[in-house]
């Protein structure tokens, strides 16, 4: 566990429980403040503080909740070989449920927004000519690919490029070396997914509709970008320049790779001119970049 106030990374436990069910919160030996006040806070308060980008709330979520989830997952029986990647999904199954929920909302939102647009790319026109099942599968694959590529790129850049979590001091002194890789992966993953989930707020627009989606979507994406950068700064302690460049580069990689793979996957099932549709997707991406530049 870590202290969410000063970042001290060798807190043995966040609270002590006595026979009378009396709970005493641990005090950080470095700053002499309560190591993690959110242990006794309601989840709603934590959610609101995360929306407000409070530093302590994000450290509690990314570091301490992730460690508690890891301890619970590791304590349960797991019959598959320990070397398999399935152990990660078993250990962090609550994180996997959170990602699944975010993806489910994102699929619905992306699908609904595309239907509301008057002009679509050639690929989307091809998809909308298919049955609802094929459309649903397409948007599931689209959202999954985009999130996978974005998070993978960001993990590689921050951990290999900027050496986050590789210094002489561990980011969490309680984590064993063999569990450190999965823990660091989860810390960055939960930070990026939760801070980026602000993109889901336009779901409210289906209740209170806005007139111009083409303006609203770039604005929401820009807010999400700022939100992710600020959350990553709190969790990783890297500078704004490094994080802005890392996230921007990861988004470009995500868009290029995901669009290319989507065209390739759809081509396996539908007959169309691959080159024409691919260049149309790249042109759409170029237009989006120009839109964001105008917003900035």
From Swiss-Prot:
Keyword list, A-Z? Endoplasmic reticulum, Glycoprotein, Golgi apparatus, Lipid metabolism, Lipid transport, Membrane, Sphingolipid metabolism, Transmembrane, Transmembrane helix, Transport, Virulence
The regions listed as transmembrane in this protein's record are 99-119, 121-141, 187-207, 212-232, 233-253
Q: Which GO terms describe its biological process?
A: intracellular sterol transport; regulation of plasma membrane sterol distribution; sphingolipid metabolic process; sterol metabolic process
* Source domain of life: Eukaryota
Please give the InterPro entries that the UniProt record associates with this protein: Arv1
What family is reported?
Belongs to the ARV1 family.
From the Swiss-Prot or TrEMBL record, give the protein name. Answer: Protein ARV1
Classification lineage: Eukaryota, Fungi, Dikarya, Ascomycota, Saccharomycotina
Per the record, the gene is ARV1
């Amino acid at each position: 566990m870590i202290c969410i106030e000063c970042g001290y990374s060798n807190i043995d436990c966040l609270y002590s429980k006595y026979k009378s069910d009396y709970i005493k919160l641990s005090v950080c030996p470095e700053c002499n403040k309560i190591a993690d006040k959110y242990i006794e806070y309601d989840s709603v308060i934590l959610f609101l503080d995360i929306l407000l980008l409070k530093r302590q709330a994000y450290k509690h979520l990314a570091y301490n909740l992730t460690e508690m989830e890891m301890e619970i997952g590791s304590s349960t029986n797991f019959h598959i070989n320990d070397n398999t990647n399935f152990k990660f999904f078993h250990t962090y199954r609550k994180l996997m449920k959170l990602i699944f929920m975010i993806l489910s909302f994102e699929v619905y939102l992306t699908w609904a927004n595309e239907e509301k647009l008057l002009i679509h790319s050639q690929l989307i026109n091809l998809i909308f000519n298919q049955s609802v099942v094929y459309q649903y599968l397409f948007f599931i694959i689209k959202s999954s690919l985009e999130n996978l590529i974005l998070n993978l790129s960001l993990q590689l850049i921050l951990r290999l490029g900027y050496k986050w979590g590789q210094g002489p001091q561990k980011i969490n002194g309680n984590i064993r070396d063999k569990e450190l890789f999965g823990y660091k992966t989860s810390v960055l993953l939960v930070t990026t997914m939760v801070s980026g989930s602000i993109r889901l707020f336009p779901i409210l627009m289906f209740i209170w509709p806005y007139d111009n989606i083409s303006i609203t979507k770039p604005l929401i994406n820009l807010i999400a970008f700022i939100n992710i950068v600020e959350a990553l700064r709190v969790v990783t302690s890297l500078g704004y320049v490094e994080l802005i460049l890392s996230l921007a580069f990861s988004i470009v990689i995500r868009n290029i790779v995901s669009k290319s793979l989507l065209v390739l996957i759809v081509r396996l099932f539908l007959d169309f001119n691959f080159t024409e549709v691919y260049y149309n997707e790249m042109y759409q991406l170029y237009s989006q970049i120009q839109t964001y530049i105008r917003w900035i």
